[in-house]
């Protein structure tokens, strides 16, 4: 029998309370007929002042008996999206991952691209299998868009560090739906799966996006200057200046050589540092 809520599975939907029962509230699609099918919202999730006819924003999924169920808890993943999820158990037929709901998400063995270990985090995509069940997959490359439609330069987006290429940079899962690149020249200390806010720095002719963890230079320089000064004031900081290697600058400050020079220029203007005869930057005594 076809699930009347299949088109809502894995999505957040605006639903309407039609009636109450011992188990909870029965919801139907807003504007549907009085005889329309309903799905259950468990009693513990019903707002205290809820009445028939009230609208509720809920996520629709299947319970352990494959019955459609509504929840006001928003999971970490919705249909067609990709996010890093933690493996909670491994069985002979697949692995279960924590996606924020009591019923964990199954990633069948056939959809795993590597052996999974309990506690590990991997990018998982959510889709409907041929039996209409919400299922996880590790085959996420084809689910992620590479064209940045809807994004603008200098817009801030949410992302998770995905794959690292020493020559190119870090590929980032952006807004759980797209792939962006944090170029190798951008300083960072991101671990795989680490979430961060990224700024879209460039949209290439082919629609791909380049990212940065930093604000535009004119906005970032104040924070960088404060950070550079704090590092220079630490005991044991080695001499550093304009002729220092980019690697040393990045190791000490987590900044590119260009950003470091901008910060030093700002500090010189403020009189917070001075240059030695050898060209090293030295913090003024406080």
Model-derived features: positions:
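Single-stranded RNA-binding regions, centering on S1/OB-family and related RNA-binding modules
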Residues: 1-286
């Amino acid at each position: 029998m076809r699930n009347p809520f299949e088109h809502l599975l894995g999505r957040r939907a605006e639903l309407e309370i039609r009636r109450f029962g011992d188990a909870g509230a029965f919801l139907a699609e807003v504007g549907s007929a009085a005889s329309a099918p309903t799905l259950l919202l468990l009693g513990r999730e019903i707002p205290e002042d809820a009445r028939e006819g009230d609208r509720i924003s809920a996520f629709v999924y299947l319970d352990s008996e494959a019955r459609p169920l509504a929840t006001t808890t928003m999971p970490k993943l919705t249909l067609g999206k990709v996010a890093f999820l933690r493996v909670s158990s491994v069985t002979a037929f697949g692995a279960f991952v924590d996606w924020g709901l009591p019923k964990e998400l199954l990633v069948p063995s056939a959809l795993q691209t590597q052996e999974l270990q309990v506690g590990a985090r991997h990018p998982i995509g959510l889709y409907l299998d041929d039996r209409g069940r919400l299922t996880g997959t590790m085959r996420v490359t084809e689910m992620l868009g590479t064209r940045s439609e809807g994004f603008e330069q200098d817009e801030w987006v949410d992302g998770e560090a995905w794959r690292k290429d020493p020559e190119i940079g870090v590929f980032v899962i952006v807004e759980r739906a797209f792939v962006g690149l944090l170029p190798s020249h951008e300083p960072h200390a991101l671990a795989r799966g680490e979430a961060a806010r990224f700024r879209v720095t460039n949209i290439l002719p082919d629609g791909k996006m380049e990212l940065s963890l930093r604000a535009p230079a004119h906005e970032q320089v104040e924070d960088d200057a404060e950070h550079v000064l704090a590092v220079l004031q630490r005991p044991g900081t080695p001499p550093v200046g304009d002729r220092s290697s980019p690697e040393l600058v990045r190791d000490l400050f987590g900044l590119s050589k260009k950003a470091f020079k901008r910060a030093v220029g700002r500090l010189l203007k403020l009189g917070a540092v001075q240059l030695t005869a050898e060209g090293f930057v030295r913090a003024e005594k406080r």
